[in-house]
């Protein structure tokens, strides 16, 4: 894998110290597959999530579960008849602890399958990035796995937040463009380490088989880790860009937007030989960013969600517009390390259309560097959800 040493260290990074019992660690892969026989194209995702792994190393603990806390003294009072059992019973919210693999499909008919395990069931390496859990394995060059959930499994464990069915994959990947600029903070970190990643292999879901081809996989790989995640989620990323100016596919181009950090989003945009990085961990004066996600009504497609970003410093301006059909968006949930049933609830989908423009600020005028159409863009938007007491 021909990437920088810093990017490789970020890929290999695992939770250390107190984060083993109070932290989240995510490896996320996104790529396109083409259905065999029909040629239908779909956007897939695979995620490895490590959440408070050593808080409960031998058992899976879901934060959606609750446990009844009963002391021996309370139990004696119930037996003596001085306190009713109903009055004594009180719920104690638990803190989650598990390893989870999520894999699914985005866009129309979106769905995901999830597999959970305790950290004791994981095989891993300290010398390189390697995780093996259940029938899934992750390494620096390959992804393989199989997840199967039947209706009785989900009925017994609704907290799995998984659809029923079967998904399997066998993929190799290579990072073509890496980025070690993103956001680094005490509470959260994000890096688009494989901002342009090529995938090759096969993936199937419920009997439908898809080929993943290097020339049009348009892949993306990022890392999220730390004691927590931002309360508000705003994400866009794509490596499928076509120049409006020349009409050519921009093979050495990608972009990623992620936040919200300190009321800003971090932006990394690589358009052929131009690279712009706006990191939210820089000083407030380093750049300005305006972002929004709103609903609009289209006469053809109905309601759409519209992501907009405009960011600038003294040298460059980047404007991004992305649209998703609202009915194709998939509601997902990410548990947070601190428990108390706190989650990030967000919509996730594949873009229906989008554009990116990059300008150079020449003081007296703006020079258009590139204007490109976006496709196969991962789009996410959501916020912290806290249960009512």
Predicted features by range, described:
Residues 1-389:
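Structured soluble/peripheral alpha/beta segments that form catalytic or ligand/cofactor-binding pockets
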């Amino acid at each position: 894998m021909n990437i920088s040493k810093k990017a490789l260290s970020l890929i290999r990074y695992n939770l250390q110290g107190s984060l083993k019992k109070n932290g989240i660690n995510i490896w996320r892969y996104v790529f396109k597959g083409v259905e065999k026989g029909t040629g239908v194209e779909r956007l897939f995702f695979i995620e490895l999530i490590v959440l408070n792994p050593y808080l409960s190393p031998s058992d899976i603990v879901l934060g959606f579960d609750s446990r009844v806390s009963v002391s021996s003294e309370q139990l004696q009072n119930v037996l003596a008849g001085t306190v009713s059992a109903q009055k004594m019973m009180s719920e104690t919210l638990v803190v989650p602890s598990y390893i989870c693999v999520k894999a699914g499909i985005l866009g129309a008919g979106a769905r995901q399958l999830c597999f959970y395990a305790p950290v004791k069931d994981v095989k891993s390496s300290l010398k390189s990035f390697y995780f093996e859990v259940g029938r899934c394995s992750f390494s620096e060059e390959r992804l393989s796995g199989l997840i199967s959930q039947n209706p009785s499994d989900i009925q017994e464990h609704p907290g799995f937040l998984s659809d029923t069915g079967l998904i399997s994959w066998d993929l190799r990947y290579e990072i073509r463009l890496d980025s070690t600029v993103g956001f680094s903070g005490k509470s959260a970190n994000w890096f688009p380490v494989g901002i342009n990643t090529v995938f090759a292999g096969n993936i199937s879901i419920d009997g439908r088989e898809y080929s993943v081809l290097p020339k049009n996989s348009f892949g993306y790989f990022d890392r999220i880790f730390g004691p927590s995640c931002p309360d508000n989620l705003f994400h866009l990323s794509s490596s499928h860009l076509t120049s409006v100016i020349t009409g050519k596919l921009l093979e050495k181009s990608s972009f990623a937007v992620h936040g919200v950090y300190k009321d800003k989003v971090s932006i990394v945009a690589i358009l052929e030989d131009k690279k712009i990085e706006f990191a939210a961990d820089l000083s407030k004066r380093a750049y300005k960013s305006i972002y929004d996600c709103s609903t609009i009504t289209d006469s053809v497609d109905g309601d759409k969600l519209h992501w907009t970003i405009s960011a600038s410093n003294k040298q460059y301006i980047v404007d991004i517009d992305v649209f998703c059909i609202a009915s194709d968006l998939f509601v997902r949930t990410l548990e947070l390390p601190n428990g108390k049933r706190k989650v990030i609830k967000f919509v996730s989908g594949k873009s229906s259309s989008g554009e990116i423009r990059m300008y150079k600020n020449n003081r007296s005028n703006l020079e258009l560097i590139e204007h490109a159409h976006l496709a196969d863009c991962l789009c996410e938007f959501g916020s912290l959800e806290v249960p009512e007491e």
